[in-house]
A protein has these predicted regions:
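Active-site pre-lysine segment of PLP-dependent enzymes
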Residues: 5-18, 30-53, 58-91
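A short linear hydrophobic-aromatic micro-motif
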Residues: 161-165, 197-202
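A generic structural signal for well-ordered alpha-helical segments
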Residues: 47, 157-158, 191-192
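Helix C-cap/helix->beta junction micro-motif
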Residues: 49-50, 160, 195, 236
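PLP-dependent enzyme catalytic core of the Aspartate aminotransferase-like
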Residues: 12, 181-182, 186-199, 205-238
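Conserved glycine-rich beta-strand-loop-beta hairpin in the small C-terminal domain of fold type I
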Residues: 129, 145-154, 165-178, 209
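Generic structural signal for small/hydrophobic residues in well-ordered secondary structure
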Residues: 22, 29, 57, 79, ...
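Conserved core segment of the aminotransferase class I/II
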Residues: 77-147, 154-156, 232
Length: 238
């Protein structure tokens, strides 16, 4: 990774003539970085050179510069894009998502879905439809939460010499790097038991240098969680 972005030269090296699929996510989970149109175009060209599909999970649609966000479906003819109302639209209980793909792949997905699910719940579909019909109001609300809480997290990080991050680009997930002399999983377990703060160990993302921080809780919960995390980190300086 280069600044938490894909190494295009490395991707070229890894792709082979028999490569069938390249998997990415945009925005990144857990980092919160967003791939720009140029990077997506380079990935598409690499995939096109071997006839591979690109599967891109776009469930973390950024709330910053949303209008300028480029979907892989708009860049590459063999893109398979997944999304849902769970993250950016804050409605995980609906359990409703969608796939954008070419006709062949779409037909295969529909056939598979007929065998595994037949249909979604009527109330789930109604809830998801309502959310998308009123998405502007929902996104306006969520932007206030994401931008305000990101500022709170940044201010806290600025006071912590053991913590750093690449600030998420309007995405509701983030990753903080921790300079601590303890295994990340052990630290997270101890933090949960001793202080009631739940973080996802970076090793679960093959990134053992830190933890995933969900910073879009209510302001008082976020501030208290960061305070307790700061106390736990301060113990390493005793």
């Amino acid at each position: 990774m280069l600044g938490w972005r894909p190494d295009i030269a490395e991707l070229k090296r890894l792709v082979r003539p028999n490569t069938k699929l390249i998997c990415i996510n945009n925005a990144s989970n857990p980092i919160g970085t967003v791939l720009d149109a140029d990077t997506l175009g380079q990935i598409a060209e690499i995939a096109r050179s071997v006839g591979a599909y690109v599967l891109c999970d776009e469930v973390y649609l950024p709330l910053e510069n949303t209008e300028a966000f480029m979907s892989m479906a708009d860049v590459y003819e063999k893109a398979i894009v997944t999304n849902s109302v769970s993250k950016t639209y804050s409605t995980p209980a609906a359990r409703v998502g969608w796939v954008v793909a070419d006709e062949e792949i779409s037909n295969r997905i529909r056939t598979y879905r007929d065998y595994t699910m037949i249909c979604g719940g009527v109330f789930n579909d109604a809830l998801a439809t309502y959310v998308l019909e009123h998405k502007d109001k929902i996104l306006e609300r969520n932007r206030k939460i994401v931008f305000g809480n990101r500022d709170i997290a940044q201010a806290w990080i600025d006071t912590q010499h053991r913590v750093s991050w690449t600030a998420p680009q309007g995405v509701s997930t983030s990753f903080i790097q921790l300079d601590i002399p303890e295994d990340d999983e052990e630290f997270c377990k101890r933090l949960l038991v001793e202080r009631g703060v739940l973080l996802v160990p970076g090793s679960r993302f093959e990134l053992p240098c830190g933890v995933r921080l969900g910073y879009c809780a209510s302001e008082d919960v976020l501030r208290e969680g960061l305070r307790l995390l700061g106390k736990a980190l301060a113990e390493f300086d005793r």
